[in-house]
Amino acid sequence: KGEAPAKSSTHRHDEELGMASAETLTVFLKLLAAGFYGVSSFLIVVVNKSVLTNYRFPSSLCVGLGQMVATVAVLWVGKALRVVKFPDFDRNVPRKTFPLPLLYFGNQITGLFSTKKLNLPMFTVLRRFSILFTMFAEGVLLKKTFSWGIKMTVFAMIIGAFVAASSDLAFDLEGYVFILINDVLTAANGAYVKQKLDSKELGKYGLLYYNALFMILPTLAIAYITGDAQKAMDFEGWADTLFLLQFTLSCVMGFILMYATVLCTQYNSALTTTIVGCIKNILITYIGMVFGGDYIFTWTNFIGLNISIAGSLVYSYITFSEEQLSKQSEASNKLDNKGKGAV
C-alpha cells in the first residue's frame, strides 16, 4: 500500500519525460518543415525570375503548365513505387478538393505573371498583403482571433508597402493588379488547405495530385486559345542548355514548393507558412536590389521597403512567441488534468 504513491509519481515523471521528448521532436519537425518551405520558395522565385525576365520566356502559362505536369508525374511515379499514398480517383474526389484546384491555378498563374512584370523588391513587398488577407481568411474560415501586437505589425508592413509603391519608378499597373490578386488567392489557398488537411479525406499527397491533375487540361486550353502555347513553341532559347536546365528546375520546383507549402501548413499553420515566406522575401528584396537588374533606387522606395521588412521581422517574432506560449499552456493543462486524474 505504501508503494503506490511512489509508483504513481514515477509513472507521472516518465510520462512527463516522454511528453518532453515528443515535444522536442515536434518542434524539430516544425522547424524543418518551415526551413524546407523557406528554401523552396526562395529558389523558385529566383529561378522563375531568371526564366521569365532574364531569358524573356514569353509564356507564364506554359511555365505553370510545366509545373502541373511535373507534379502529377512525380506523384504518380511515387504512388506506383509505393513511396507515397493517396486515394484513387472516384466521383467524390472533385467535391473533396473543391475549390482548391481553382485557387491553385489562379495562385500559380498570377504569381508567375507578377514575377515577370515586377522587380524583385516590389514583388516581395507587395506579397506582404498576403499576410493581411491570410488573417481575414483564417478569421472567416477557421474562426481564429489575432492579438493587438500582430495587428500593429501587419499594419506597419502594409504602410511600408504603400510608401515603397508611392515612388516605384518601375511602376507596372498589370503587375500590381496581378500580385494583389495573387495575395488574396494565397490567403484563401492556405486557409482551405488547412481545412482540407484537418478533414483527412485525401491527405497532403492527394490534395497536391488532384489540384494539379484537374487544372492541366483547362490550362492547356487557355494557353492554346491565348496563343501562349504557340509563343512558347516559337521561343528561340530551347537550344540553350542553361535555359533548359532552369526551365526544368522551375517545373520541378513548382511541385517541391507545393509539397513544402502543404507540409509547413500541416506541421505549423497557414499563418506560420506565410511568415516564413515573408522572411525569405527579405533576402530576395536585398538580393533583387543588387542582382535583379530591373530595380530603380529612390530613397522613399528604399525606406518603404525597410519599414515593411522591420514590420515583418517583429511580426514573425510575436507570432512564434504566441504560438509557443499557447502550446506550453496547453501542455501544462494536460499535465494538471492527468495529475488530478492520478490523485
From Swiss-Prot:
* Transcription as UniProt keyword: no
* Ranges per topology, Cytoplasmic: 1-26, 78-144, 194-204, 263-268, 324-343
Question: What's a GO cellular component annotated to this UniProt protein?
Answer: membrane
**Biological process per Gene Ontology, one example term:** nucleotide-sugar transmembrane transport
Which domain of life does the protein's organism represent? Eukaryota
**Membrane spanning residue stretches:** 27-47, 57-77, 145-165, 173-193, 205-225, 242-262, 269-291, 303-323
Q: Where in the cell is it found?
A: Membrane
Checking InterPro entries in the record gives: Sugar_P_trans_dom, TPT_transporter
Extracellular topology ranges:
48-56, 166-172, 226-241, 292-302
- Entry GO MF terms: antiporter activity; UDP-glucuronate transmembrane transporter activity; UDP-N-acetylgalactosamine transmembrane transporter activity; UDP-N-acetylglucosamine transmembrane transporter activity
Q: How does it sit in the membrane?
A: Multi-pass membrane protein
Q: Provide this UniProt record's keywords sorted from A to Z.
A: Membrane, Transmembrane, Transmembrane helix
Disulphide bonds annotated for this chain are none
Keyword Protein transport included in the entry's annotation: no
Q: What PANTHER family has UniProt attached to this entry? A: SOLUTE CARRIER FAMILY 35
**Recorded family membership:** Belongs to the TPT transporter family. SLC35D subfamily.
* Name of the featured protein: Solute carrier family 35 member D2-like protein
* Organism, scientific name: Sus scrofa (Pig)
What lineage does UniProt assign to this protein's organism? Eukaryota, Metazoa, Chordata, Craniata, Vertebrata
